[in-house]
Amino acid sequence: MISLITYFGVVHYNFYRRHVSLRSLYIILISMWTFSLAIAIPLGLYEAASNSQGPIKCDLSYCGKVVEWITFSIACISLAITASLTGFAVISLHWYNYKSKTNGVDVPKVTTRARIRLTWTFFALIVICLIELLPFGLVIGNDKSSLQGCDSFYNANELLVQSIISSVETLVGSLVFLTDPLINIFFDKNISKMVKLQLTLGKWFIALYRFLFQMTNIFENCSTHYSFEKNLQKCVNASNPCQLLQKMNTAHSLMIWMGFYIPSAMCFLAVLVDTYCLLVTISILKSLKKQSRKQYIFVVVRLSAAILIALCIIIIQSTYFIDIPFRDTFAFFAVLFIIYDFSILSLLGSFTGVAMMTYFGVMRPLVYRDKFTLKTIYIIAFAIVLFSVCVAIPFGLFQAADEIDGPIKCDSESCELIVKWLLFCIACLILMGCTGTLLFVTVSLHWHSYKSKKMGNVSSSAFNHGKSRLTWTTTILVILCCVELIPTGLLAAFGKSESISDDCYDFYNANSLIFPAIVSSLETFLGSITFLLDPIINFSFDKRISKVFSSQMKFLRSKVFCASSSSLSRNDKIIKDQSQIE
């Protein structure tokens, strides 16, 4: 229609002005849509029936081929008629332009634009004919369009050509349909004017927006921009916002790498190692006699607590950097902190229990044999768990109240300060008590070993393993005291928070955020390293667990080597058979 209207409007202007009215164009347009729907509806239904089952039955062997050929024939006729009419109009316009130039008549710019636009339309139509008719005709001509299921697999060698044809058809068609409106709009005078007007208005709107909001965009002149700066646009009282933004980004980077990514990976590995050691310990515990089970009761408590601590560290650090569910609820933080405090206290109790068991087993063997029965050990372990629950619940509730608003209100600075120092003092007492007990037992064992060597007595391997394991446990506890008490005490003394928020207070004090970020990140980083190394080093000194681990490694090694050797022998046999055949 565009080609015919352009033809009559340029070559036969009087006919176009008298007979081609707006009403007649609407009638022709409605007729085209009606004719297209009348053909498209039945063809579309039969094409759908040939591709999937439905109310209309059309098998692929006969009906599908008939539908394909009918569709192909109608497409050929329609495209041929359209291409012929458009080609006739293009040739006529070019001939009209040539005659006008020969006669010395100036051709209007509107006519030149229409001729160029119609030439592009004709070129696009030729391309569409090629990409629609040739590939489709080749596919149905070779009878490969209905290959499905096993037929596609059996004729896989012939599917490559079909795939290339279909892909090229889609790619070239998409390029044509993308380029067509752009070139057509470019040669249309009215649409080009409207596009230029809209671009000009857009530039004015952008300039007006920058003018109105340049006072609030405090980071506009900064050389480096960060994702979190949009939350700090309201902090307009900063004297040097770019420098504060860089300081805050440094603190964020420290917290997210040394306080989240690396510790989370180490804690995840620690969970895997602790779980493996826990399963091995439980299997060993079931096979031991009552007298030998006593030393592994606290080991089970220790491993269970270490698993919970590592998981809590991952979740707690995730709340500061990831939008996890329930992170804005008091109950979530309360449960999380209660489990974390319970696990820490249970771990400290298991440390103390192992130390006392080792001390009485070496220094007071009769007391250990007669007084410390298996029932007594279970009672002590239950008492440790009960004490941990009783202390962890108020601890966790007040820690959650300090983190987020909830049923327990602690909004004033005096309340927060009192709660922080109270929790810090109680944690100091518990940690120092456990550390003192372990130091006493460790020093006693080393003194006993020194006296035995001086008297010429040879210490047993079990005693040496126990002494080494207890020395490592004491070292772990000292490190825990350092990473738990020193950073918390320093931050509480200087009135700093362990987390960094995107509010204006932290932004205005960004120069002093580096210190709490380093302290908090080191606390989490060293703690994660400790919880990863603890089970590995501890159970390398345990004879029974080391034996189980060694036997499992030997079993896996034998299985792997047997499988590889059998596969190699099988390959050698195949090669020999092939050589004999040749």
From Swiss-Prot:
Organism domain of life: Eukaryota
Keywords, in A-Z order: Cell membrane, G-protein coupled receptor, Glycoprotein, Membrane, Receptor, Transducer, Transmembrane, Transmembrane helix
InterPro entries: GPCR_Rhodpsn_7TM, Put_GPCR_Chromadorea
Location of this chain's protein in the cell: Cell membrane
Gene3D superfamilies reported in the protein's UniProt record: Rhodopsin 7-helix transmembrane proteins
Classification via SUPFAM superfamilies: Family A G protein-coupled receptor-like (SSF81321)
CDD domains listed in its UniProt record: 7tm_classA_rhodopsin-like (cd00637)
This protein's GO CC annotations: plasma membrane
Membrane topology: Multi-pass membrane protein
Keyword 4Fe-4S: no
Molecular functions (GO terms): G protein-coupled receptor activity
Coiled coil: none
Glycosylation sites: N190, N221, N237, N457, N538
Family designation: Belongs to the G-protein coupled receptor 1 family. B0244 subfamily.
Name of the protein: Putative G-protein coupled receptor B0244.10
Organism whose genome encodes this protein: Caenorhabditis elegans
